[in-house]
Amino acid sequence: MAKKIGVTMEVGNDGVAVITISNPPVNSLASPIISGLKEKFRDANQRNDVKAIVLIGNNGRFSGGFDINVFQQVHKTGDLSLMPEVSVELVCNLMEDSRKPVVAAVEGLALGGGLELAMACHARVAAPKAQLGLPELTLGVIPGFGGTQRLPRLVGLAKATDMILLSKSISSEEGHKLGLIDALVPPGDVLSTSRKWALDIAEGRKPFLQSLHRTDKIGSLSEARAILKNSRQLAKKIAPNMPQHHACIEVIEEGIIHGGYSGVLKEAEVFKQLVLSDTAKGLVHVFFAQRATSKVPNVTDVGLKPRPIKKVAVIGGGLMGSGIATALLLSNIRVVLKEINSEFLMKGIKSVEANMKSLVSRGKLTQDKAGKALSLFKGVLDYTEFNDVDMVIEAVIENIQLKQNIFKEIEKVCSPHCILASNTSTIDLDVIGEKTNSKDRIVGAHFFSPAHLMPLLEIVRSKNTSAQVILDLMAVGKAIKKVPVVVGNCIGFAVNRTFFPYSQAAHMLANLGVDLFRIDSVITSFGLPLGPFQLGDLAGHGIGLAVGPIYAKVYGDRMFRSPMTELLLKSGRNGKINGRGYYIYEKGSKPKPDPSVLSIVEKSRKLTNIMPGGKPISVTDKEIVEMILFPVVNEACRVLDEGVVIRASDLDIASVLGMSFPSYRGGIVFWADTVGPKYIYERLKKLSETYGSFFKPSRYLEERAMNGMLLSESKSSRSKL
């Protein structure tokens, strides 16, 4: 039976009209809900038998905020009229300016537009542990129902700017201390207390307070300006390329200088401008792209149910293995960690303990929970504990023969239902499992380092992997708070393959005479957290040197070969691992560019000898971004063409979560579509004419450029899934 969506009103014998929002699961404020609220508030205000009003959400949730689907519709059509009028017509006129008091009965959550409705009420009664916040900036917009004006007046300017700029939610308990919540009562008493409170206001026993007109928590103008100055510095630091943070501060300032209602009008104007910004389009796209990853054709739509995974064995206790073990333990999954000798095993155990300790010291985990997690952990040197595990994750070095032997051994000792997963990032799954008889149970579980912190899990499906195994691993991914993205089997899979040109393009530029520290600076200014040389230092240059030949074997027609990494290692520089790479790493301080590395770069330039006329090329920052990232887009096109991902948006979310491509740019494919396939094709064609096949446009990119199509528009008929 379909759940009813709408707004209802019931008037009790006490004269209180209870208006209820019903839109499962979180009572989001879709257009029909907003229309219903307007209708019911008009009705309640006009009826003589109504003394006061209580606003509540159905099924123990007040409201999760405005319906994000509307943003998506606006982005597709460019039609702002799809955005309903809420801020003035409903929130100000019908609710806050109502002659009859309105009390919000808050349970579960009041987020975004939900909290904004609650703040327009004349009082707020809440149950404990309700979640309160204004997360709109994470979608590229600002609060649009008066939140920029009312929150500072209820909790103070400093706390309000902190909550809004950082999209930080608080509990109803904290809200009560701050004055956002007027009364905190047991869940069963929220409605009855709200009714009584509303009547007490109506009959003069409690004050009739309009949040928009309060000034008692704003402070003096000079104090407000000092807080806003700090807020601008914070915005510059956390969101240098995004407009919504600075716009939000401007709107808050408008209300402080010219009054709350003036601020509301400015907020509505700025909100509409931001809705159509590239930033909002990118962030909303990422939101829906993440949702879409949970739908995998012929896996999630064929009636299968995930099997419980209660015990997992991890083989290899290095950086990756210990991180994977940590992630599993944090979700109360028993873990057996296997190593080849006692020394390596102790290192692995200590790494897991250090991960837990770090989370506790940063306030991300309580000591009790860390202790409970570690009680589920056991280290072993043989396979005796493997007979009852539900899954094995192999996380040893990238050695084909070693991995083949491990899979042959675990097939013998594990139960027939056990999932056999590899964390390989470069080796073909079919090759790893070719000596086994259990090819349907073999799957890639590619975590990103550090595995207990990075949010992406690439689930790699070979031509033999069963749908049940994929579904089981997707469930495990969600249980350990990862975003699982199912991809096809190829060298590098989706993320590493798409981004392998990233460091190569940077090496080409450096060998063409461009300053490598400038390259890193330009790329971080674009929005990636690390430039290509910083990333190389972080990963360790030994890894780059080891995987290079694997990629060259398969993708050799479009690789740039540079001696720079080898020269770096020969000079004793392995990056952050040993304190020196392109940068100097000292404990307690930020990495510093190492000028002495330039002699190595110069040697590499002489050996490659690609500078035109022996002189460094001159490039703009824009050209650096294009020469680094357009080859990445080009490889993304090949990934799409070969059907390595189910949909283009899967590659977007994988690029954001796996390579930290800026979410506000929507992911690598979305960004490329924003720039324009034709422009990218023409630039790559020109670059290939000057610098060779590394930049040669792919067939997929050329087709879309010539036909005026977006890269995301058409899925390849080929599939590796």
UniProtKB/Swiss-Prot annotation:
One of its GO terms (molecular function) is 3-hydroxyacyl-CoA dehydrogenase activity. Keywords: Fatty acid metabolism, Isomerase, Lipid metabolism, Lyase, Multifunctional enzyme, NAD, Oxidoreductase, Peroxisome. Its EC number is 4.2.1.17, 5.1.2.3, 5.3.3.8, 1.1.1.35. PROSITE patterns: 3HCDH, ENOYL_COA_HYDRATASE. One of its GO terms (cellular component) is plasma membrane. A motif (Microbody targeting signal) lies at residues 719-721. It catalyses: a (3S)-3-hydroxyacyl-CoA = a (2E)-enoyl-CoA + H2O; a 4-saturated-(3S)-3-hydroxyacyl-CoA = a (3E)-enoyl-CoA + H2O; (3S)-3-hydroxybutanoyl-CoA = (2E)-butenoyl-CoA + H2O; (3S)-hydroxyoctanoyl-CoA = (2E)-octenoyl-CoA + H2O. The keyword Lyase applies. InterPro entries: 3-OHacyl-CoA_DH_CS, 3-OHacyl-CoA_DH_NAD-bd, 3HC_DH_C, 6-PGluconate_DH-like_C_sf, ClpP/crotonase-like_dom_sf, Enoyl-CoA_hyd/isom_CS, Enoyl-CoA_hydra/iso, NAD(P)-bd_dom_sf. GO terms for biological process: fatty acid beta-oxidation; flower development; jasmonic acid biosynthetic process. Involved in peroxisomal fatty acid beta-oxidation. Required for wound-induced jasmonate biosynthesis. Possesses enoyl-CoA hydratase activity against short chain substrates (C4-C6) and 3-hydroxyacyl-CoA dehydrogenase activity against chains of variable sizes (C6-C16). Possesses cinnamoyl-CoA hydratase activity and is involved in the peroxisomal beta-oxidation pathway for the biosynthesis of benzoic acid (BA). Required for the accumulation in seeds of benzoylated glucosinolates (BGs) and substituted hydroxybenzoylated choline esters, which are BA-containing secondary metabolites. In the N-terminal section; belongs to the enoyl-CoA hydratase/isomerase family. In the central section; belongs to the 3-hydroxyacyl-CoA dehydrogenase family. This is Peroxisomal fatty acid beta-oxidation multifunctional protein AIM1. It comes from Arabidopsis thaliana (Mouse-ear cress). The lineage of its organism: Eukaryota, Viridiplantae, Streptophyta, Embryophyta, Tracheophyta. The gene is AIM1.
